[in-house]
A protein has these predicted regions:
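FAD-dependent oxidoreductase catalytic-site/capping-region signature
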Residues: 51-58, 68-264, 272-277
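Glycine-rich loop(s) and the adjacent beta-strand/alpha-helix scaffold that form part
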Residues: 1-70, 79-80
């Protein structure tokens, strides 16, 4: 059921942190402190620029054009709707000596409003800065013992100062990249966070309000040895201490991967399904 749904189901079933389940009036089946803990994601921050040429997707998002794009895709599987519009992605190291790419930069030929998620009404583009291996950890908690109540998702983005420092470094790297001559005929004014937003304090103020998710939540029922009190499943996805129960999704990852979670989740499902079947 995913990194949110799987710990939710386990805790409702009495498998999870003893004190938390008791506070929700749920009978304990197995005291498992790691259920719902260790939540990881790839935090995301968007830098937006005016585009000096009329080459963005903004005109195609107007009502009639968007209807036409939908019809085109239904008939031909081509056109604007055939792309996710992250046409260029770079996985980079934030500096010398960094062991693995710890930043993901994605450029999109349109800029969106952070609140409404509607396109800005001008030719503009945005660059996403994503953290690939965070130090901050969140958690999933029950809101009640009613299965229809959604759980609490506490992501704790940038709580660890190392994540905040890395995000600021990513913003500076994007600005350095966009200042290269190859972008001179495209890059206009920085719309957000703005050319005057340079100090750590100013950037942190923007990060606090505008850091969002890449929707790569994982690691809330992590795989590990039975001797690890925070491990939930073994290397076959079997829940420790429970017979005939497995979890097979992104929640069992011990650490979030250095990239999108879709392909690794498919790999996990393919691998464990061979054992089940």
């Amino acid at each position: 059921a995913g990194a949110v749904g799987s710990p939710h189901i386990l805790m409702l079933s009495g498998i999870g942190p003893k004190d938390h389940l008791k506070s929700m009036g749920i009978n304990l089946v197995v005291d498992m402190p790691g259920v719902g803990q260790n939540l990881q994601d790839h935090p995301d921050f968007m830098i937006k620029y005016k585009c000096l040429k009329p080459v963005t997707l903004w005109p195609k998002t107007k009502r009639l054009n968007s209807i036409g794009a939908g019809v085109q895709w239904l008939l031909t599987k081509e056109g604007m709707c055939a792309s996710n519009h992250f046409d260029s992605v770079a996985c980079i190291r934030s500096g010398p000596g960094v062991e693995y790419p710890d930043l993901q930069l994605c450029i999109s030929p349109i800029a969106m409003d952070d609140n409404s998620w509607q396109p800005l009404k001008e030719h503009a583009f945005q660059v996403h800065v994503g953290l690939m291996r965070t130090h901050s950890r969140g958690k999933i908690e029950l809101r009640s013992n009613n299965p229809t109540d959604p759980p609490r998702i506490l992501v704790n983005y940038l709580k660890d100062k190392r994540d905040r420092e890395l995000m600021r470094k990513g913003i500076h790297l994007v600005r350095e990249l966009l200042d290269q001559p190859s972008f001179s005929d495209l890059k206009g004014e920085e719309i957000f966070p703005g050319d005057n937003c340079k100090s750590d304090a100013d950037l942190d103020a923007k990060l606090n309000l505008h850091t969002t998710s890449q929707w790569h939540l994982a690691c809330t029922a992590r795989m590990g040895l039975k001797t690890d009190k925070y491990a939930v499943v073994d290397n076959s996805g079997k829940v420790h201490g429970i017979t005939s129960l497995r979890v097979v999704d992104a929640s069992i990852m011990p650490f979030a991967p250095n990239g999108n979670t879709n392909a690794p989740t498919i790999m996990i499902a393919e691998k464990i399904s061979d054992e089940i079947l």
